[in-house]
Amino acid sequence: MANNDNKHRRSMSMLLYIAVAIFVYLLLSNTLLPGLLRQQIQTVSYSEFLNKIESNEVTKVDLNTGNRNIRFTTGSGDSEKIFETTQFPNDSTLVQTLREHKVDFSASIPDNSANMLMYALIQYGIPLIIFLGIGFFINRSLKRAMGDDGPSMNFGGGFGGLGGNLGRSSAKEIKGEDTGITFKDVAGQEEAKESMQEIVSFLKTPDKYKEIGARCPRGALLVGPPGTGKTLIAKAVAGEAGVPFFQIAGSEFVEMFVGRGAAKVRDLFKQANEKAPCIIFIDEIDAVGKRRDASLNSNDEREQTLNQLLSEMDGFDNHKGIVVLAATNRPETLDKALLRPGRFDRRIPVELPDLKGREAVLQIHANDVKMEPGVDLSIVAKSTPGASGADLANIINEAALRAVRFGRRRVTTEDLTESVDVVIAGAKKKNSVLSEHEKDVVAYHETGHAIVGAIQKNDAPVTKITIVPRTSGALGFTMQVEDDERYLMSKSQAMDEIAVLCGGRAAEELIFGEMTNGASNDIERATAIARAMVTQYGMSDKLGMVTLSQQQSRYLGGGSSLTCSEATAEEIDAEVRRIVEEGHQRALQTLKENRFKLHEIAHYLQKKETITGEEFMNILKRENTFAPVDKNINDEGSSTPSEE
C-alpha cells in the first residue's frame, strides 16, 4: 500500500514538474525566441526595396500572396542578406520591374500546415527536451547531495521543495542499546553523570514522577571545553535509559534554501514524537542558537530556524519522555530565550578532568590496549594537567602505535612517557641538526628554566629536561609536574611562575651576553600572566582590586578585551612591564647565585640531551665540583666565551 502511494505521489510530482517546465518554456519562447528570429531578417520600407532593385542589388524575390509580404535576398554566398517588406497595394508595375532587372521571383499561396508543424517541433520541441533534461539533472544532483540516489522526482510534498530530502531532518537515529555506551564508559565527569542520572530515571520509570506531579526537565545544556566528553555523556544517557537517540549538529539545520532549516526542526520533533520516549541531541547548538539582534550581520534563515526550535521545545508534551540535550563550548553566544527554564532547564558543566579524573580516563582507554604489568598511569595523569579526555585517549593511542613501531606486543611506561611528549610538544625531529653553538644556547636556556623553578618555593618540581628539537618548533623544553592538583594561585605563586618563564632568557643574557628569539613563547606566557594579574585578579598594588577586562570564549581559549579608558590602559601596560621585569630580575639574580650549577647542569644536558628530574636534582644538591672552563662570567653578570 505504501509503495502504491509512493508511486502515485512520484507520478503526480513528475506531471507537475513537466507542466511547470512547459509553462516556463512557452512563456520564454513567445517572448524571447521570436524576437531573436526576427533579428536575423531585416525589415525595410517598400521604397527602399524598389531602390535596391533599381541598383541591381536584389538577386531573389519571394512574393507571398497570403500575407502580402515580400521577402527578398541581396548578394550571394557569405554576403547574402535577407530582407522583408510589405507589398504596396495595387502596384501593377512590380512584376514588370523585376523582369527588366532580371530578378528571379516566385509567387505562391503557401500551405503552412507542414511548415508550421516542423517549425513548432524545431522551435518548441527540441529546446523543451533540453530544458527538461537540464531540470532532471539538477533535481537528481540535489537528491544525491541530500542522500537520496533514487531516480524518481519526489518533491517532498510540493514542487517548492526542490529535492526529496531538503525538508527532512538529517538526524541520525540510534537505538539506545545500540549506542554501546553507558555511564561506566564515562570517567572524570562524576558531577555531570550525577546530574544526568535523574533524566535517566525519568525515562526508565516515568510513573513515579507523574504520580507526585513532577515533570522531567525538557532540556539540558552541556557546557565545556572541546574534547571533554559532552557527546559521550549524551550517548551514555540514551544507553542507560535504553531509548532511541537522535543526533544532529547545529550547523545541519541551516540550509541555502529559505525555510528549510525550520522544516528540518519540525521533522526532527515529528520523528521524536513517533519514537517517544527518546533523546534529541544537538551538538554545537551555538551554530543555530546564537543570540538574535538587529545588526546588519543578522541571518534571517538562522533566526527563523531558531524560532522554530523555540516553538517546538515549548510545544511538545514532556510527559511523553522527550528530552533535548545540547552541547556547546560557546554558551555566552546563545540566545537568552533558549536558556530560560522550560526549554533548557539545566546547565551542566563538563570541565577538564582533575588528577583523579585523568587517571580514571586513562584507565578506561588503557582497557582496550595491552599493557605491560606494572605500568603506572598516575605518572601520566600527573604529567598532563589541563588535558581533556580526547587528549588522554590520544596519548594512549600514541603509546600503542609507538609500541608497534618498535616491535613490542605490549605498551611500556617508556611508550607512555614518550607519547606525552609527542602530544605536548610534538614528535622528535630526526633530521634536525643544531650547530654546537645553538645546542649550547638551548642547553643553557632550558637549564635556566629548571634552576629558577627548583629554587622558587612555590614552583612545581622538575621532572624532565630535554634539548631534542620537536615538530612543534620547540628546540627543547623543561617539564614540571605538581605533586597535587592546584585550584588557586596566589600572587607569590604567579610571580614565581613569571620568574621561571624568564629563566631561559636570563641564562642567555648571563652566559652569552646577548639574547635570541628562543624565549618568544616564554615572554608571551609571562606577559599573559602579568596582564591577568592586573586586569582580572586584582593583584596590582597600583590599580587595586578592580576588573579591567572581559574574557571572551572562555572554553575556546579566547582572549580578553579591556573595559577601561585609554589612560587606564596605559597604566595597565606600564604595570605589566613592571611585573615582568621584576620576574626577569629575580631570575637573573637566582642564576648569578647558582652560576656554577648552571654550567655543570648545562654541560651534562648537552652530553645526554635528555635528563630526568632526579638527575637534575642530584647535580643541583651536591657540592660545587664543576669549574667553568669555556665561559668567563664577570661580576656584572655579562659573559664572553673563552678562547679554545
UniProtKB/Swiss-Prot annotation:
It is a multi-pass membrane protein. Keywords: ATP-binding, Cell membrane, Hydrolase, Membrane, Metal-binding, Metalloprotease, Nucleotide-binding, Protease, Transmembrane, Transmembrane helix, Zinc. The keyword Glycoprotein does not apply. Residues 1-13, 139-644 are cytoplasmic. It holds the Pfam family AAA. Zn(2+) binds at H445, H449, D522. PANTHER family: ATP-DEPENDENT ZINC METALLOPROTEASE FTSH 1, CHLOROPLASTIC-RELATED (PTHR23076:SF113), METALLOPROTEASE M41 FTSH (PTHR23076). This is ATP-dependent zinc metalloprotease FtsH. It comes from Lancefieldella parvula (strain ATCC 33793 / DSM 20469 / CCUG 32760 / JCM 10300 / KCTC 3663 / VPI 0546 / 1246).
